[in-house]
């Protein structure tokens, strides 16, 4: 049976929120919330934060977590994860989960959701989660990455633009957004990092487009849990309110 490990990529630098992984969230650094939620998944046999910053590395070690130092420059979080897993004893068919370091309230059961396709189909290289959009403003917002997929739930394209374009609005359609949790076959991570940057990846600034542009399948799985990614202090305040609401 394949092993499932989870790597949390985390960077200190951010144009909109410098140092956000270490931002205080209800008495803990945000990255600790992510790490502790990962450990609630019974499927995960190992978890670590992959970072290029000593402050994040030391903070993770301080709360008892595992951390892996990586090179400072990587094209994407997936490339950073690929470097991190080189230090682990993994087989080619083992599964590596990527949970973003800015998703402190993701649901641990989503790890089971995103890994299910790879556990059921050994030929799949990667999978990711999608969520049906309910907030109308997200349909046109570039930070909500839209996705279209075929009848077998293989991604056709991801875009910051509104896709699909509905020419005749008499036919209502459901829009889906990408939820940034991935699962990869360990062997595919080697393949992915060896690929050159894709044209669409560069234009949209979406790493998953590299896989699609070079002909690799990405299975999408609909989750019923919305994502709240912290990119600004305002979004951190929103997450804090959500956590405090749960505590009451």
Curated annotation (Swiss-Prot):
Has keyword Iron-sulfur?
no
InterPro entries linked: Cytidylyl_trans, KdsB, Nucleotide-diphossugar_trans
What's a GO cellular component annotated to this UniProt protein?
cytosol
Keyword Phosphoprotein appears in the UniProt entry = no
Q: Which domain of life is it from?
A: Bacteria
Chief place of localization: cytoplasm
GO process annotations (BP) = CMP-keto-3-deoxy-D-manno-octulosonic acid biosynthetic process; lipopolysaccharide biosynthetic process
Can you tell me which residues the record assigns to a coiled coil? Answer: none
Which compartment or compartments is the protein found in? Cytoplasm
**What's one Pfam family the UniProt record gives for this protein?**
CTP_transf_3
Family matches, as Gene3D superfamilies:
Spore Coat Polysaccharide Biosynthesis Protein SpsA, Chain A
Q: What is this protein for, i.e. what is its function? A: Activates KDO (a required 8-carbon sugar) for incorporation into bacterial lipopolysaccharide in Gram-negative bacteria.
The family annotation for this protein states: Belongs to the KdsB family.
UniProt name for this protein: 3-deoxy-manno-octulosonate cytidylyltransferase
Q: Which organism is it from?
A: Syntrophus aciditrophicus (strain SB)
The organism's taxonomy opens as: Bacteria, Pseudomonadati, Thermodesulfobacteriota, Syntrophia, Syntrophales
The gene behind this protein is kdsB
